[in-house]
Amino acid sequence: MTNTDAPNVIVDFEIDAELVFISIKNSSNYPAINVRIKPSESIIGLGGKKDITDLAVFNEIRYLAPYKEIKIFIDSYHSFFEHLKKTEIDFAVYYADENGQTFRKKILHDLNIYKDLVFFIKKN
């Protein structure tokens, strides 16, 4: 089995119309089984009231279909950066394919790249 014949789970941040989301996506033709996502930092959302990383979706997604995306609202742009403790967040992502082969990857995010984007988003 080659890597192109395997699930590929990614975790990313999205800014959309001054709102911030986390996206969990299987960007392959193959399902991902028992997906677990471990962030290096808490991600505080909903006006500073909720640790988004406490959601069950980070503990286990039993089946993530091919090209399936789960998009989680975090907060408004300004509130998100106001409550953000660290701008660098890593995600350790664990999952398996249907044959039981396990995969692990680390996805590194530097959220500083998003800090000035709101000015461009507002203009559109």
Protein language model features and the residues they cover:
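Short acidic, gly/pro-rich beta-turn/loop elements at beta-sheet edges
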Residues: 21, 32-34, 47, 82-84, ...
